[in-house]
Amino acid sequence: MADGEDIQPLVCDNGTGMVKAGFAGDDAPRAVFPSIVGRPRHTGVMVGMGQKDAYVGDEAQSKRGILTLKYPIEHGIVNNWDDMEKIWHHTFYNELRVAPEEHPVLLTEAPLNPKANREKMTQIMFETFNTPAMYVAIQAVLSLYASGRTTGIVLDSGDGVSHTVPIYEGYALPHAILRLDLAGRDLTDHLMKILTERGYSFTTTAEREIVRDMKEKLSYIALDYEQELETSKTSSSVEKSFELPDGQVITIGAERFRCPEVLFQPSMIGMENPGIHETTYNSIMKCDVDIRKDLYGNIVLSGGTTMFGGIGDRMSKEITALAPSSMKIKVVAPPERKYSVWIGGSILASLSTFQQMWIAKAEYDESGPSIVHRKCF
């Protein structure tokens, strides 16, 4: 099936914060843009300005001053299908510049995605975009494939939601999947708050983007939080400076590791949930006792919010403290983990053995949207 780009499958990973899209067989997504749709706040007064009724992605981001921005995906789950359709349209026609009716499309979904949502995705692909074939895969499973494994537990943490997903021989174990509504956006908000305490004011959505950039460039996870705090009080070794777009330079020290510490101590932002280490442990404990050893030895990190320096060592330390003392613990943090869901999709869609797994248009026409539950699991 894979003979050149004419019928190369498309892979589209729709995240809360970013859409990652491209062609199966590539080693990285061609298009990465924000999952946002913006509509003008006011009607245009300039005649012939060619105002659009909606802007998507980077264009919406850059014109955010005159737009009302909406995120059609919240906590990993689509909640606004009209806007989602606009995002897919933009992905195919503007970003990848392909005709979706000529390519099979692999979409990704959050773990525990409601059944009605999978059906809706399937329906839109076949009825709105007329794709010849499609498939829906669980994000965490794709990340595990990308790491070259079929068994393990994936901690997938993006912008809107984190999940721990135990996978055995390629199948996610739904009863043991745990969701934590704590992710990148919450960390950005927390950093905005601790910078405000220091007298810097970041409030607008535009300023939030600056803080997100600061978080991504300067934050790291301390191996021992209390000790790191002590060090930061007496020494300037953790201080780093950051230049704002207007040329002002700000210096941040302890904020660098205070921000992502929330992942391990959600109580810092008033959440009662256990941290990512405990959630991972709880997920493993919900699995059959015979497979736990395989899970402890294959803890795979995935998603943009796992990109902080020091996260692998800290995760390893925390889980070792929770697990039985004789247990061998291995935390895998692949360098490309920001895109590992997409990469896993690219690998899967280009396997020769996968070609009979696609839902073909003819099958959809015969069975309707519920076909997705029979063919994608």
Swiss-Prot record:
> Cellular component per GO?
chloroplast envelope; chloroplast stroma; cytoskeleton; cytosol; mitochondrion
Cystine residue pairs: none
Entry keyword Cytoplasm: yes
The main place the protein resides is cytoplasm
- Annotated compartments: Cytoplasm, Cytoskeleton
Q: Which InterPro entries match?
A: Actin (IPR004000), Actin/actin-like_CS (IPR020902), Actin_CS (IPR004001), ATPase_NBD (IPR043129)
Instruction: Cite any additional comment in the entry.
Output: There are 8 actin genes in A.thaliana.
Q: Can you say what this protein is called?
A: Actin-12
Naturally occurring in which organism (per UniProt): Arabidopsis thaliana (Mouse-ear cress)
The organism's lineage is:
Eukaryota, Viridiplantae, Streptophyta, Embryophyta, Tracheophyta
